[in-house]
Amino acid sequence: MALRLYDTLTKEKRDFAPLDPSNVRMYVCGPTVYDFAHIGNARPVIVFDVLFRLLRHLYGPDHVKYVRNITDVDDKINDRATRDFPGLPLNEAIRKVTEQTEKQFHDDVDALGCLRPTIEPRATEHIGEMRSIIDRLVEGGFAYVAEDHVLFSPQAMNAADGILPRYGSLANRSLDEMIAGARVDVAPYKRDVTDFVLWKPSKPGEPSWPSPAGIATQGRPGWHIECSAMAWKHLGEKFDIHGGGIDLVFPHHENEVAQSCCAFHTDRMATTWMHNGFLQVEGEKMSKSLGNFLTISDQRDQWGPAVLRLNMLKTHYRQPIDWTQHNLSETGRELDRWFEFLESASGGDPNDANDVMSALADDLNTSAAITALRVQFKNKNSAALRSGLDLLGIPIGREFIQGRKHVRLYAEGAFVAAGGGTATFSTASSSVERSDIQQLIDARAAARARKDFKESDRIRDQLAAMGVVLKDGKDADGKPTTTWEIAR
């Protein structure tokens, strides 16, 4: 099966041909560990996890190398460390911030069903590679030293003869456009407004290392050089796929291309560039000032990992996504129906999931893949539905629908639809009579029996609004049962 991927550089969808099919290599920009990851950060992690799974399926698990970095040296980290741990030396405070944030990131993305990358390098472990690349760039005339800074010159890159790409080609911008749109307050040590920092001197107390290019004072790397160095160390001078969010195309990825191609005299850093679209919340840009800033951890409290992952994949990765409560609720209900079916169903042909595979092979078209899953559910092909969910990395089970706030099942409240007493239970929103809960459960059971799923879903939502969460199953005789819990 041919894999076709959209390349940001060429602006076209092309057949994917790895440089070495026995060693398929992919690099994705990872987190800067200064704050908990928000739900927008989860999008590239999930998208490229699906691609990683697909590549492993096509080429074999032992023939795919996936690198996703950890940026652990950055001004934002320094600022957070100073704010959160004012009584500690800065380096010790930085270590606390980065360790805590990295642990939370791993907890979050592991919960979302994402495989760990083959290699997860930290920037601070690759300072030597950064200095080596910078020295090459200075020696080649592509970078210069000024006031203990090392700066890259896009003008020098575009003036060079040979196979080097033009600076701005990835973002489809010309240098003239960049110069015209540049800020007026340009640092005095820059020769040109488009020059960017490869290395800078450290302030007292900040992390610092011996500088490249013969600079006597110690310093630290700029952001862009970090990824060039880590990709070179673990994937080589040229590799197959470089991914990240659309916001990274310029300047970050453009600068990576410039650094790597000029240092190693190559025409491309990666043969395919892939970028996922923006995420907004309820039709608005996510912002702390708007009060709609959603961390992955917050969303895990409210929604199960299967809901978060499937909801993310319903939109094609290159399209913008609107993250809404309504869509999450719809996704949860759909998964509930699928998982209820899978609890009791068996049989079918797993090869029927080839439609899911074909959709993924067409530029990772997860929305089409999910449409194929709906067909398998409609056809009651449990084997194909399971296989397709596995390809998408969706964990199967009712426990993966509910968020962490819905974790405790009341012992006295766990009863089948035919039972129940008259005790009153306090929920997050009201006091509820057990008999009222039972009446609604009975009405919902009747709706399900006549296959009126719209009414069944309405009653489930009504109970959820009351703070009651339902769990459907079957008894020993195979008859439907419903248990409930109070959302805490």
UniProtKB/Swiss-Prot annotation:
One record GO biological process: cysteinyl-tRNA aminoacylation
InterPro entries registered for this protein in UniProt: Cys-tRNA-ligase, Cys-tRNA/MSH_ligase, CysS_C, Rossmann-like_a/b/a_fold, tRNA-synt_1_cat_dom, tRNAsynth_Ia_anticodon-bd
Annotated residues for binding of Zn(2+): C29, C227, H252, E256
Gene Ontology cellular-component annotations: cytosol
Keywords, comma-separated and alphabetical: Aminoacyl-tRNA synthetase, ATP-binding, Cytoplasm, Ligase, Metal-binding, Nucleotide-binding, Protein biosynthesis, Zinc
Enzyme class, UniProt record, top EC level: ligase
Cofactor binding: number and manner: Binds 1 zinc ion per subunit.
EC number annotated for this UniProt entry: 6.1.1.16
Motif ('HIGH' region): 31-41
GO molecular function terms listed in the Swiss-Prot or TrEMBL record: ATP binding; cysteine-tRNA ligase activity; zinc ion binding
Compartment annotation: Cytoplasm
Binding site for ATP: K288
Catalytic activity entry: tRNA(Cys) + L-cysteine + ATP = L-cysteinyl-tRNA(Cys) + AMP + diphosphate
Chief location bin: cytoplasm
Needed co-factor(s): Zn(2+)
Any single Pfam family the record assigns to this protein: CysS_C
Motif 'KMSKS' region per UniProt: ranges: 285-289
Domain of life where this protein originates: Bacteria
Family per similarity comment: Belongs to the class-I aminoacyl-tRNA synthetase family.
Subunit structure, interactors included: Monomer.
Protein name: Cysteine--tRNA ligase
